[in-house]
Amino acid sequence: PREMLSDAYEAAGVTETLARWLDGRMIRLVTVDTIDSESWFSADDREWRANRQEAYYEYVAEEVVPFVRSLSDWTRLPVSVGCGFGGTHAAILFLRRPDLFAGLISLAGSYDAKTFFGGWLNARLYDNSPLDFLPNMANEHPYIEIYNARKMVFCTGQGEGLDESRRTTDLLRSVLHERGINAWVDFWGADVDYGWEWWKKQLVYFLPYVLGR
């Protein structure tokens, strides 16, 4: 789907899949609507679309994350998690503000914004395109130390609907290696398609690693 609404996780059965973590109060799941139909998948002016994506990023980083932290007396930082294009958003948020998060799980994300803008890129979209801003990050940038203090997962399958995710995840793996950034980059098999069936399995598989359990 091109628009991921906040009830998608519950509708897909993710709350049931993660019940033991939720019921045991090991995690709290907070989901957020996207506006991808106005940004990544719109036919409108490209600069306006890029501005909409930046506004979404700022909303989550500056309003949603503080709200999430206010819900609990836990001192732990939240984990940025997303599936499909939600994985793209989760990665952008984490890579731009690793100080806000304890870790990242990006499933079936795509990391080259230019693909969705006909090869076009401006300064605003650059900030939302990990395959553009990460290669230019200086080796001494303080975020690299923060990245390496966190647990990051980038996972994609090699089945239907995942060509762009597979392509950009492979490129991202190379960039992370070149920058000396540690991450778990995992490619599942050719039978692993785009969709909740596999994302739920991947969440169960990777969540203990990111939570340190």
Feature locations, PLM:
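Non-catalytic cap/lid and distal C-terminal segments of serine-dependent acyl enzymes
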Residues: 1-213
